[in-house]
Amino acid sequence: MSGLLPVDLRGSPSMGGDRNHQRDDGSSEEPTILQASDIGRKEDEKEFDYEKGSDKGPDKWGEIHEEWSTCKHGNMQSPIDLLHERVQVVSHLGRLQRSYKPSQATLKNRGHDMKLSWEGDAGSIQINGTKYELKQCHWHSPSEHTVNGKRFDLELHMLHETPSGKTSVVGIMYKIGRADSFLSTLTDHLEALSDSSDQERDVGVVDPRHIKIGSRKYYRYMGSLTTPPCTEDVIWTIVNKVRTVTREQVNLLRVAVHDDSGSNARPIQPINRRSVHFYRPRVEDKN
């Protein structure tokens, strides 16, 4: 089972007390994507940090601006620990339906992470019969989500939105090992940003199909953006398979940001009464 999140979920109970706004968790709709950042007030990257005890740290995000109060008072916040005792195994959610395509992109240092944004149509995913358009991806180290308390070395978030502003994010976890081929294509651009004061760089055409997922299994739950304004009602899909990345690639993502911080991972948030589902295809669906 090397490279897979450890899952033995048969007979796991469903979390009770679903809220109405958890409409997507128990439905028979298609999977979702992790979209995590540009809703409501666009965060000023210098206005918050990840330092424990800092006046701008995660415990204080909800007090910095009124528009960020959900970071403190929300009850569907992300990330969470994907504890197997809470997870209900389902087979009706269906495979992730991705229809990505190459498009012009830019790489931007947001002060707390590196964000790759597609300027044109980079394709979409289908979630619950709705098309979510791929907007950007960014990285957190170490991972923000945990599995049975285990934190991984890196987490990629692929942010998708509908024209009406609904958000879905797909998260992919990484452990130290062989190089990630998608990050390898961005190495020269990351190094260029780390060696200069530039905050943004045109990286030409980038094909999101080169982001490897490698598993049909995934977790799904309703949560929030993991950075201010911590907007809720985000559909999260966390891919079951753990990919690999080199330590040098993880370090480069941090060095290029110039924030002198060893982490940009938000602490784990209370799950409250939310449901967490784990999609596992039926035997007849595997072909």
Set out the residue ranges of the language-model regions.
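Alpha-carbonic anhydrase
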Residues: 1-287
